[in-house]
């Protein structure tokens, strides 16, 4: 089961809501996955989904809250996945006109009915109704990627005006949803992991939220370990390269003028580095008598490298 299906399965069990919340929720579902059909003077409305839990919820809300006994149909998809497609249909005899009016989908102006692509503010004038609306939008047209791979949550809509309204509604909760066009659709999306967690909390997907949080924590721990390993590897590589360079410089001095020509403090460090090419500066310093700190050893080795460079260029 995909992570999207898990989220939808969870929030579709969220049915202990008021009639006002149910109205907000079914309005959002109808806006994002519904189509209006005309046959002569008759109209009908169809909601389409591949998720059986979503279809069941649509049917239940209409029956329990609005006394509408919708028609539930199932057919095979023509896509390669061969999933079932579930359709919840409300006809004129079932009271579709009244439903379209109270959900803010149809609006009558001067006796003429027209489609309203905006979100009716009366449907989302409380925080709970806003949450119910966003939950409905996810049930009807939302999806979330596998958090093991990437963080991405989106709502697919078919109107720019509606997508912008939905984005603004989501952002009233302090989120940063954005809108883009993808072919003939308008996508409201969130890509930041922490914000996706917040949105799951808003729509009531608490089990999915905890699963995502656990994945985020594990990914962060793995990333921290990888950064630490990479950092230590880089430091080790830097240390090894420095040691190799120091040994080469000391051997050059030994070959050209002999280590005996070096001052005692430099000669002692040079001899130790030749004998212990893999030891750290701190460990070399502890072998000296009296012991010398890491910075002191580093200073002496830099002087040795400078002498070697002068020998290479003939300036010694």
Curated annotation (Swiss-Prot):
GO biological process: cell division; regulation of sporulation
DNA-binding region: 280-313
Signal peptide: none
GO MF assignments: DNA binding; endonuclease activity
Keywords: Cell cycle, Cell division, DNA-binding
Stored Pfam families: HTH_WhiA (PF02650), LAGLIDADG_WhiA (PF14527), WhiA_N (PF10298)
Keyword ATP-binding in record: no
Domain of life: Bacteria
Protein name listed in UniProt: Probable cell division protein WhiA
Xref: PANTHER family: CELL DIVISION PROTEIN WHIA-RELATED (PTHR37307:SF1)
Function: Involved in cell division and chromosome segregation.
Similarity-based family: Belongs to the WhiA family.
Keyword Cell division: yes
